[in-house]
Amino acid sequence: MCGIAGVLSASFLPNGIEEILKQAGSAIAHRGPDDVGVWVDKDASIGFVHRRLSIIDLSPAGHQPMISATGRFVIIFNGEIYNHLDLREELEKSGRAPNWRGHADTESLLAAFECWGVEATLKKTVGMFAIALWDRQDRKLILARDRMGEKPLYYGFFGGLLAFGSELKALRKIPGFKGEINRDVLGLLMRHNYVPAPYSIYHDIAKLPPGTWLEFTPEILNRKEKPVPFVYWSAKEAALTGVADSYQFTSDTEAVNALEKTLKQSVSGQM
């Protein structure tokens, strides 16, 4: 488990943005006690903070925020990509792999985004994750969440400033945070015992739905638009496809064996 947070401005970043990001990171330090990283590009009016819990690559090569081999992309990422070695192998076979600096899944993810783009990479990726990706070339911020929404990702608009984070605690440290309770959501909280996406307990702060990604640019912030998430995976569509393509087992034993095989494959990919 790691923690991420960041801001994107339509004009200028607040004064002392590095310290603000450090405070946002400190608010979620329990998510990543091993390392902290801050990256700010004042010319692009964007800043990231990452709290790291080292799991796969324990070396400094896994430090975040991480910049891609070409320098085009900057990423902060919370979670784990279970098939990142498969992604590396596919990149290497295509001849488009970079010179690997380490063996972190973050680096694999960055190289995949650079090679295949956002949507194709998300569809190939198996894991639990919340991602913030800055495209320096197109001046575009991507926020993405895993298929089942295992890793949280909140975002909100504070004037001309977009802020996002793994937890609401991080957003409370951003200038302009109001903390006004969304009373319309209280009914959902009482009914489900949690606040479902795309809502949060606060006005003007949303939770990115599972299996989706968002694009933000300074122009979008200037127009005060609220972009609609792109869906790269849907549980409902997956279920309908499964029913349509269902295999007709000849016995209960055959069905049980097939289920056991599928579960073993799924669990082994996470070991």
Question: Which residues fall in each region the model found?
Answer:
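Cysteine-centered catalytic environments shared across enzyme families
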Residues: 1-271
